[in-house]
Amino acid sequence: MTSQAALKLVAKEEGDKQRALEAALAQIDRAFGKGSVMKLGEKGKVEIESVSTGSLGLDIALGIGGLPKGRIVEVYGPESSGKTTLALHVVAEVQKAGGTAAFVDAEHALDPSYAYKLGVNLDNLLVSQPDNGEQALEITDTLVRSGAVDIVVVDSVAALTPKAEIEGEMGDSLPGLQARLMSQALRKLTASINKANTIVIFINQIRHKIGVMYGSPETTTGGNALKFYASVRLDIRRTGSVKARDEIVGNNVRVKVVKNKVAPPFREVEFDIMYGEGISKLGEVIDLGVKAGIIDKAGSWFSYGSQRIGQGRDNVREFLKNNPDVAADIEKAVRKSSQKIEEELLVGGPEEGEED
């Protein structure tokens, strides 16, 4: 066979393949609707939409300016570390942008007055206090499938008690029941979350594994399914107290991006959570301004441009509170320097024994 004839045969085979592919795509479109299968390049550059976390540093650490829409997010940590506070800040940001938010309060512990102080619009917040885990996840699924809700917060996975456990006796042993419930629910939820472009935040608690000799003994409740399905996992820890003279007025908090499917993970950020106020934005503006070289720090004195803005962090915070224009200028400059700050926020990879 001549080389020309061989080329014609290859071209014919390629043409047959193309026609077969077109026929298959047409059949899929008829069966499942237009756009069920498409070439990735047809959509152009796929931009991931995000919602601010209410923390300037955490938005930078996440790499896309906040939490990704249409994804599952897990926020976990010890008790009183700021998990619900962080989730309520995200709810407030969604509402500010005109979105609809829902809060599935499985713990029956939501404080409306605290949520209001963080900027949550209580009149427009959908709240559910379900009786059992199945009911909580069914409500979450229905809200997501409606396509009308922008964020759903489930507080918390540990409180999603299966119906069989509630109806059983106090000492009954029901191994793996909650893990199976979460696994089944996430299989159902994940596709509809993506289609509806809804953020679903699962707040989770920490437990300790017995008999672990090496690596971290810590694990989260509800089995391994959530670890796999979550696009972003945030580990939040209280590292100290914020004091005004002798009075404790807040907590120092460290958040580590343990998993991130939309940007590089393992970034770590610290900020203050003030009692009755939430995340201290001005405190972050000062700290990140110093990191980016926008605010100069010499000893205990802080300067912005040629102007001295205060001695000591508390005095600088007070100055920025009284001069919101200066604070806004510094924040704008910090956001422009986000790439430089991102590199400084990078820490090591996962700790030994830490699961993805």
Swiss-Prot record:
Keyword check for DNA repair: yes
SMART domains: AAA
GO molecular function: ATP binding; ATP hydrolysis activity; ATP-dependent DNA damage sensor activity; damaged DNA binding; single-stranded DNA binding
Compartments it resides in: Cytoplasm
Residues binding ATP: 77-84
One Pfam family named in its UniProt record: RecA_C
Family as reported in the entry's similarity comment: Belongs to the RecA family.
Function: Can catalyze the hydrolysis of ATP in the presence of single-stranded DNA, the ATP-dependent uptake of single-stranded DNA by duplex DNA, and the ATP-dependent hybridization of homologous single-stranded DNAs. It interacts with LexA causing its activation and leading to its autocatalytic cleavage.
Name of this chain's protein: Protein RecA
UniProt organism field: Caulobacter vibrioides (strain NA1000 / CB15N)
Gene: recA
